């Protein structure tokens, strides 16, 4: 029973954090212009892809080396 309570509390906490981040992002986007959002979105996606690929490469080389 205690494990179930801990799991439920963890899920609730993570859900609230996710909701809070999404709400903040939505408010920030509402303040910016549509063109600016599109440009920033492309830059963010490119940066995320780069970080992902670097992390993946580091993981693979760590496993091989």
From Swiss-Prot:
It holds the Pfam family FSAP_sig_propep. The modification Leucine amide is found at residue 64. InterPro entries: Frog_antimicrobial_propeptide (IPR004275). One of its GO terms (cellular component) is extracellular region. Expressed by the skin glands. Induces contraction of smooth muscle in isolated guinea pig urinary bladder (EC50=4.66 nM). Has no antimicrobial activity against the Gram-positive bacterium S.aureus, the Gram-negative bacterium E.coli and the yeast C.albicans. Elicits histamine release from rat peritoneal mast cells. Belongs to the frog skin active peptide (FSAP) family. Brevinin subfamily. This is Kassorin-M.
């Amino acid at each position: 029973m205690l494990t179930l309570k801990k799991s439920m509390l963890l899920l609730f906490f993570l859900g609230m954090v996710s909701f809070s981040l999404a709400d903040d992002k939505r408010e920030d986007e509402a303040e910016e212009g549509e063109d600016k959002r599109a440009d920033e979105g492309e830059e963010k996606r490119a940066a995320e892809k780069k970080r992902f690929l670097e992390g993946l490469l580091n993981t693979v080389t760590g496993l091989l080396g």
